[in-house]
């Protein structure tokens, strides 16, 4: 691995999966580092990208001959550009019966995961790679207590931490190009959106709702579109790894529960750019700082689990009286509640939601955690109070 590359935690999950399946599917957002991780993890395998028109044409014209070039397997990038190749890949791996033969990557889930799991059932191991985690960023630069706003404002796409562009690449410039190149091109192409202004408004309205309950009817009304269009557009944003819908945990413990999901963006830098936050200093006093911090903690939790190769079993819990647990993850027969507070000074009031949940859930409730924007970590009244600085390495 090049000394310029930030070591990705998911490489261990990737190596483990490659010993158990003939095909490894590495999926995630565009520009999250999938190609770099795949090539650095399997340096001896030939590399081809189906984004290249000539390569794609060769594979389309004669799929069997194309795959026959790689008797020891290959890294096939952007497989979503030619999903028909998966059927031919099935025949190759069935004949070879070797583990870790092909590595395929994909940036969009528009039916891609379904195609992969159906066509290559029992033959493919899945690894999801999101943007850089805090621990990965900290492996290359010192993180101190004053950098939270900068980290949230910058976001976690690897390009923004490239030492070759240090100081030259501004987050705003990068996100402007990212949205123009990928969001507008890819998403609009799939949806067939003709009214760009309305679609842009939809994305902005989604950004203003990050970490909030998703009322699809209200979102559609605010954008002047039908609820069915809003549902379709949102599903494509989710398939593009731009947003994630966090589902409510189903056990009610005798309470009436909210059934709506919560909407989260998967990168706070992109979220800040969409919300027109101009700098880390502006973020410090921004009205959306609390929701942005909650978004950041959720994505860190998700990255930690996915990087270990674990299922993304993260939920929230909220009853119709407003008692809410921001994050809830099951482990064995217990449920572990996490409260998220952006403040820097601890308040005992922050413990109330977890205490009420423990009362409702009884023995089902595991030890609670409160994650906050301060620098110290400690335990009080049976609850772990975790600084944002150490939270990502202890979740899940």
Region roles according to the model:
Residues 130, 373-396:
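Domain-level recognition of nuclease-like catalytic cores that cleave nucleotide substrates
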Residues 26:
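Hydrophobic anchor at the beta1->P-loop junction of P-loop NTPases
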Residues 34:
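Conserved lysine of the Walker
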Residues 171-335:
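Accessory nucleic acid-recognition modules appended to NTPase machines
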Residues 37:
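Hydrophobic positions on the alpha1 helix immediately C-terminal to the Walker A/P-loop
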Residues 2, 107-109, 113-215, 241:
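Interdomain motor-coupling "hinge/lid" segment immediately C-terminal to the ATP-binding subdomain
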Residues 86-110, 118:
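Conserved catalytic/switch belt of AAA+ P-loop NTPases
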């Amino acid at each position: 691995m090049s000394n310029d590359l930030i070591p990705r935690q998911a490489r261990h999950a990737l190596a483990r999966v490659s010993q158990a399946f003939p095909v490894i599917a590495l999926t995630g957002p565009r520009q999250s580092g999938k190609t770099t991780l795949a090539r650095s993890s399997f340096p001896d395998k030939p590399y081809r990208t189906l984004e290249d028109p000539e390569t794609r044409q060769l594979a389309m014209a004669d799929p069997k001959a194309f795959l026959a070039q790689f008797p020891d397997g290959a890294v096939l990038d952007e497989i979503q550009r030619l999903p028909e190749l998966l059927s031919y890949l099935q025949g190759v791996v069935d004949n070879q019966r070797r583990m870790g033969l092909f590595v395929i990557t994909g940036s969009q889930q528009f039916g891609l995961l379904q195609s992969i799991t159906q066509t290559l059932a029992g033959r493919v191991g899945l690894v999801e790679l999101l943007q850089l985690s805090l621990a990965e960023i900290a492996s290359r630069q010192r993180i101190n207590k004053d950098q939270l706003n900068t980290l949230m404002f910058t976001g976690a796409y690897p390009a923004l931490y490239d030492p070759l562009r240090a100081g030259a690449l501004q987050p705003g410039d990068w996100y402007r190009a990212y949205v123009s190149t990928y969001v507008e091109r890819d998403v609009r192409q799939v949806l067939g959106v003709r009214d760009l202004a309305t679609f842009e408004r939809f994305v902005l309205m989604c950004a203003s709702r990050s970490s909030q309950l998703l009322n699809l009817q209200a979102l559609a009304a605010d954008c002047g579109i039908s609820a069915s269009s809003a549902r379709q557009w949102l599903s494509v944003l989710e398939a593009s790894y731009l947003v994630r819908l966090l589902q409510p945990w189903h056990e009610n413990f005798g309470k009436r529960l909210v059934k709506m999901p919560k909407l989260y963006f998967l990168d706070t830098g992109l979220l800040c750019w969409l919300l027109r936050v101009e700098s880390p200093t502006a973020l410090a006093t921004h009205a959306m700082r609390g929701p942005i911090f909650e978004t950041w903690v959720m994505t860190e939790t998700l990255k930690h689990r996915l990087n270990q190769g674990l299922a993304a079993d993260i939920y929230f819990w909220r009853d119709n009286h407003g008692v809410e647990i921001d994050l809830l993850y099951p482990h064995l027969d217990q449920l572990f509640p996490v409260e998220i507070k952006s403040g820097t000074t601890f308040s005992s009031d922050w413990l109330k939601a977890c205490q009420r949940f423990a009362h409702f859930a009884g023995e089902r409730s595991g030890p609670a955690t409160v994650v906050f924007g301060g620098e110290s970590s400690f335990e009080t009244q049976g609850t772990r109070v975790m600084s944002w600085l150490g939270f990502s390495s202890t979740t899940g």
